[in-house]
Amino acid sequence: FDEDRFPVLTGRCTECGFCVRCCPGGDVDFPVLSQQLFAATYDPADLQGYTENLFISHPVDQAVRFAGASGGLVTGLLLYLLAKGEIEGAIVVRMDPEKPYQSQAVLATTVAEIRDAAQSKYCLTPSMEVLQELRTRKGKFAVVALPC
């Protein structure tokens, strides 16, 4: 990646077009997607999309709840899983301490690191490097991510 976090061609591109087939950067055809995945008709007026159930929740810890963007549920869940020994850590996104205008994916293994990553980040955040780190680690890890 360059300094602006855009991919740099390294001379290994074979021009096969696989990357464009995986993520063409175009629109999602929601009517077709709804029919294929849910056998349901897509209604653009329904802002929720296809749902079976909706739940509302937040952590009991008020500090975690109000430090989050929308109630702190993900942060609270990660802290619970870490405390219970269900995970050894989580790949989360935080703001880069050296470049506070950029986000970065990190492997958080402590309460402080998980709390530091609270709130949603709507930024392009490369995560393959930190995902590769999991290859050398043993244990269970959570991944917090938003789809593209």
How would you describe each model-predicted region?
Residues F1, F6-G26, G68-G72, C148:
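Cysteine-centered iron-sulfur cluster-binding motifs in ferredoxin-type domains/subunits
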Residues F30-P147:
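Iron-sulfur-associated redox domains of electron-transfer enzymes in respiratory
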